[in-house]
Regions:
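Glycine-rich phosphate-binding "P-loop"
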Residues: 1-2, 97-115, 237-252
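Conserved Lys-Pro-Asp/Glu-containing loop-to-beta segment of HAD-superfamily phosphomonoesterases
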Residues: 6-34
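Acidic, divalent-metal-coordinating active-site segment for phosphoryl/phosphodiester hydrolysis
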Residues: 30-45
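Mature, well-folded catalytic/scaffold domains that follow N-terminal targeting or propeptide regions
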Residues: 53-54, 60-61, 65-92, 112, ...
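Short glycine-rich phosphate-binding loop at a beta-alpha junction
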Residues: 132-139, 272-275
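Long, charge-dense
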Residues: 156-200
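A charged, amphipathic alpha-helical module
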Residues: 216-278
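Membrane-proximal basic amphipathic "stem/tether" segments
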Residues: 492-564
Length: 564
């Protein structure tokens, strides 16, 4: 057939319509077939850069990502890049303050979204390959993956459940003897009070033992401080004295937990899998012991070699981005920025403590840790992730959605941001605390709030060290606008869409396509209208269309032109 790149199609149109070459305006997005070839024939051209081409010139990271993807393309990854480009890079005139414009939704859609979409598609693949009938997404780290799974694969013949889960919820039900309790005593103790330690580590509250019992072991009251230097012998003696209470409580928690898990069908003989962020398969191992069920698989974003200490059968372990490797490996983003990954994976909810059986089901007991700032940030980020999932589900077939995304490409933008953060974007995480129930009792931020921006100790304790360096060694480049370049240079006889450098007006995403149509309309009408009609169009566009007797022009204005 006739092709643009050879010029045959243009020759046919010119001859068929009996027009001169310079009386034609050709509009297209391909620099070769839509611009260079027709321009060489004397045809007027109007180049509309593709969204993906605009994206490549937005930031160095976007260009590197798009170029790398083009060399390692899979249908699903291509769909993700195209969808992101069409949403955010359809207008080359947009103002570029920073890669994500400090927009948490955009960050979720563009940077974190590909991480979760890739993980979710791989979860499906692993479940099918291992004949897994039920997937159990564990709170809070895989709520966003659970939601994406149900958006992308609503008709799959695999049950998906979201269950409340935490290290605390299984550690106490696993206590069955004094020996188990003494092992817990000799673990690291960070600065706390005796009552808080007994509640967090052994599950018993103040109303279950007296102050007099504490005083036998040099503990004056419930709020007596303890830490790493407090006598382990005295704590061992105290725990032994309280062992009957602790073990009875553990037994009841175990019964409640088994009933809760069974209510979700985990007591089945079929192959099932828990889905979690990672790393050492401790939750998988705990459920195997509590339910006395070996055929529980673990599907993780990352697994470390320590997982084999908990689950010896490696065929039950599945890692997406990292599998059974050293947790200190610098080549994986989740290894170098583990706490940040955990904080952003984690749903906007409080940590699960235990289920309590009631007449109407189960009461879900959660921690009271003040996590409001993180939860507000995560809600917006996760809403961006889910919007990406919805857009993919609405626009692509199951054959595409069933594809694969290389984890390093899925996390490319996210990891780039963590390694070289722009300060304007980094401030999206201002005041977000990292929660560590078993770690030291200090406030550790992803990005310090304003009241601590000059507090060296608080900055030193930031878990995001690259962001901390912005306070210690600020560089001018962190606050300047990103310099943009036009996707293509103007060529002879070509009309460019590039705006004046001084034009600071930022079009809203919803207006981008309307703006583009308006520009195209003006170019066409200025080119082909003559004399009074052209002057009337330029003077009063609305009146020009309303007074026109041309059916095509009137129909165009009614359907399209009147919208802007």
């Amino acid at each position: 057939g006739l092709k643009k790149k050879t010029g045959d199609l243009f020759k046919y149109v010119i001859n068929d319509n009996r027009v001169n070459n310079n009386e034609i305006l050709h509009i297209g997005d391909n620099i070769e077939g839509d611009v260079r070839v027709p321009s060489g024939m004397g045809i007027n051209t109007y180049h509309i850069p593709r969204a993906i081409d605009i994206a490549k010139f937005y930031t160095p990271e976007m260009k590197s990502w798009v170029d790398t993807v083009s060399l390692n393309k899979t249908p699903l990854l291509d769909a993700v890049v195209t969808t992101i480009s069409n949403r955010y890079y359809d207008d080359e005139s947009q103002l570029k303050l920073s890669p994500y414009c400090a927009d948490k939704f955009k960050f979720g859609y563009q940077a974190f979204g590909p991480v979760i979409i890739g993980f979710t598609s791989w979860i499906k693949k692993i479940a099918i390959e291992n004949n897994i009938k039920k997937l159990y997404f564990l709170s809070r780290d895989t709520k966003v993956a659970y939601d994406c799974f149900n958006i992308l694969y609503p008709d799959i013949n695999i049950e998906s459940h979201y269950i409340y889960s935490s290290r605390r919820s299984v550690s106490i039900p696993l206590f069955k003897s004094k020996k188990d309790l003494l092992v817990e005593v000799y673990k690291t103790i960070y600065s706390t009070t005796i009552s808080a330690w007994l509640e967090n580590r052994f599950g018993i509250t103040k109303d279950q033992y007296s102050v007099e019992v504490l005083q036998k072991y040099s503990l004056k009251d419930y709020d007596h401080p303890i830490g790493g230097k407090f006598s382990k012998d005295k704590l061992s003696q105290l725990v032994c004295e309280l062992s009957d209470i602790i073990l009875e409580n553990a037994k009841q928690e175990r019964i409640n937990l088994i009933d809760y898990l069974s209510s979700h069908g985990m007591d089945t003989n079929e192959n099932i899998a828990v889905v979690d962020i990672g790393y050492a398969a401790s939750m998988q191992s705990a459920y195997q012991k509590i339910l006395n069920k070996e055929n529980i698989h673990g599907i993780y974003y990352a697994t470390f070699n320590s997982a084999l200490k908990n689950v010896s059968d490696s065929s039950l372990l599945h890692g997406y981005s990292v599998h059974l490797e050293n947790p200190s490996s610098p080549k994986y983003g989740i290894c170098s920025h583990r706490f940040f990954y955990e904080t952003i994976f984690c749903d906007a909810d409080n940590s699960f403590i235990k289920p309590i059986k009631t007449n109407n089901g189960f009461e879900i007991v959660k921690s009271k840790f003040d996590d409001s700032t993180r939860q507000t940030v995560v809600k917006e980020i996760h809403s961006g992730v889910l919007a990406l999932a919805h857009d993919l589900a609405e626009n692509y077939s199951s054959s595409v959605l069933n594809g694969y995304i290389d984890p390093s490409l899925g996390s490319f933008l996210f990891d780039s941001f963590l390694k070289t953060p722009n300060k304007n974007d980094a401030e999206m995480f201002k005041g977000v605390l990292f929660e560590d129930a078993t770690g030291p009792n200090i406030r550790r931020y992803l990005f310090v709030p304003d009241e601590y921006k000059n507090d060296k100790k608080t900055i030193d304790n930031m878990i995001w060290k690259e962001a901390a360096s912005l306070f210690i060694n600020p560089t001018p480049s962190q606050d300047v606008k990103i310099k943009s370049e036009p996707p293509v240079k103007n060529i002879n006889n070509t009309i460019s869409t590039k705006q004046n450098k001084n034009d600071k007006v930022k079009a809203k995403p919803s207006e981008c396509k309307q703006n583009r149509v308006a520009v195209i309309e003006r170019v066409i009408f200025e080119l082909f209208l003559k004399g009074k009609k052209k002057n009337k169009y330029l003077r009063d566009r609305s009146m020009f269309f309303k007074d026109s007797n041309n059916k095509f022009i009137s129909h165009y204005y009614k359907i399209i032109g009147s919208k802007f």
